[in-house]
Amino acid sequence: MQTAEKYGMRDIHFDFESVAPEDREAYNRFLRNVKTRLPNGYTLSTTLVPKTSSNQKGKFFEAHDYKAQGQIVDFVVIMTYDWGWQGGPPMAISPIGPVKEVLQYAKSQMPPQKIMMGQNLYGFDWKLPFKQGNPPAKAISSVAAVALARKYNVPIRYDFTAQAPHFNYFDENGVQHEVWFEDSRSVQSKFNLMKEQGIGGISYWKIGLPFPQNWRLLVENFTITKKG
């Protein structure tokens, strides 16, 4: 609270990942205790992993109680990204179909205005062929991804099912790569989904990666307000 007051912040956010399943109720109690102690004018929010059912198995999922947290906190940020991740095979980072399924489940557990859809500002560059145990894929910004495609003079393709751009190239050592990232088309599809689902807003990971088209489209699609 002292840090929040020092910098004029008004939201206390908890991003606790990989919480043990047996600590699910303890985490809920912790959030209730925090909420009761917050001074007037402060909001409480949390990050949730992407789930599609209340009984979804796996230690990554079980401790995140959508219904309870939807009752306790002022809003949640759902990590609707990393289907394609550094340690897995090449694929879209936030394919539109799975993202929609998560948002629909979240809406069944809490008021839609409390839901913030997570949106990645990054992509990944995988070396091929992919094998478990390979070095992790390299994170790359959207601007850097387009520059890379231009450097190697390769076409950028678009997966209409996932609503995501991607391309392949061979580097100077003859190693083939596969890149998935975000562009204006993929982001617009997410904005359309947000409107369709009637959720509260969007949250980005991570701020600082260059993606100018996103900010232009954000202003074109929504009325941006700044509180405080």
Feature map (PLM): residue ranges:
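Receiver (REC) domain switch/active-site residues of two-component response regulators
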Residues: 10, 74, 200
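Conserved, mostly hydrophobic/aromatic
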Residues: 14, 76-78, 117, 194, ...
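Substrate-binding surface in catalytic domains of secreted glycosidases
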Residues: 21-151
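Short acidic, glycine/proline-enriched helix-loop-strand junctions
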Residues: 22-25, 29-36, 40-42, 158, ...
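Glycan-binding loop/region signatures in secreted carbohydrate-active enzymes
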Residues: 121-190, 219-228
